[in-house]
Amino acid sequence: MLKAGLKSIASYIPEKILSNADLEKIVDTTDEWITRRTGIKERRIASENENSSDLGTKAALKAIERANLKPEDIDAILVATLSPDYFTMPSTACKIASNLGLVNISAFDISAACSGFIYLLEQAKALVESGLKKNVLIVGAEKTSSIMDYNDRSICILFGDGAGAGVVSLDNENHILDVHTASNGNYGDLLMTQRSQKSSLCQTLSMQMKGNEVFKIAVNTLSNDVVEILAKNNILAQEIDLFIPHQANLRIIKAVQEKLNLSDEKCVITVQKYGNTSAASIPMAMNDAYEEGRLKKGNLILLDAFGGGFTWGSALLKFGGENF
């Protein structure tokens, strides 16, 4: 029986660069401190007239083309974002569908913060393998700058904008072997997007995070999660060809990498140039690996992510072909 596979991957990177040196002029921080604590050197910022749906549409068009499909071949669009175009509706997925000229298809958003792309893979795999859908477009798109308080030096240094997309279809070469997702809402107040005026719908939104607590829980949770998904599938860590984690913080990535005893050659790291792009970070990093020639036929790929909610997840993919 054919299994669901990720047939393509693509990304869109905004042109504007916001470097650590630039942030030194905005808040009380230094390049040395940011680099030492996070590994981030710069991040990308979308233009004022670009929304998450615009970023996502540009990545989506590339992903559809790389899958050797046309927009009209897509029968579902799933989007993960914590920075949607609109507060409640319409969904960013519906906006992307409109941008692609598509109607009468399933289109909805998933709210799983930085774990969003793992959740998308799980849902797309289920839709395709059940026979409900044939070609599911999954998009992680973030304009985090739209909800960022650039007076808060503890958080504005971390995030950037961007988008990544892929197409999930039945495939005899590229397989989504397994996906695991989980959550614990008891920690929701440690990382959230807060309303400025709870009594009014006319309010601004800003992200807030208790970084030290999030860091500790993220490292422990991710370390355990990747060990569990490998054990469940009878796979040894040394069999992993490429580890592509959510790009939140270099210290978190390195902690999980060390837990798995993986070499630097097997670990894809892009946080230094993009910052934390939330739901977009994994597909953006995967696209970089593809364009750099690091994705090889037959590769076994491990993904993992942790985000607000708390949510987390991991996935095992087999890259079997040359499609993307």
Curated annotation (Swiss-Prot):
Q: State the InterPro entries in the record.
A: ACP_syn_III_C (IPR013747), ACP_syn_III_N (IPR013751), FabH (IPR004655), Thiolase-like (IPR016039)
Write down the superkingdom of origin.
Bacteria
Give the first-level EC class, as a single word.
Answer: transferase
Q: What GO terms fall under cellular component here?
A: cytoplasm
Span list, region ACP-binding: 247-251
| E.C. designation(s) | 2.3.1.180
Q: In which pathway does it act?
A: Lipid metabolism; fatty acid biosynthesis
Which compartments does it reside in? Cytoplasm
Q: What is known of its domains?
A: The last Arg residue of the ACP-binding site is essential for the weak association between ACP/AcpP and FabH.
Its job = Catalyzes the condensation reaction of fatty acid synthesis by the addition to an acyl acceptor of two carbons from malonyl-ACP. Catalyzes the first condensation reaction which initiates fatty acid synthesis and may therefore play a role in governing the total rate of fatty acid production. Possesses both acetoacetyl-ACP synthase and acetyl transacylase activities. Its substrate specificity determines the biosynthesis of branched-chain and/or straight-chain of fatty acids.
UniProt family annotation: Belongs to the thiolase-like superfamily. FabH family.
Protein known as: Beta-ketoacyl-[acyl-carrier-protein] synthase III
Identify the taxonomic lineage of the organism of origin: Bacteria, Pseudomonadati, Campylobacterota, Epsilonproteobacteria, Campylobacterales
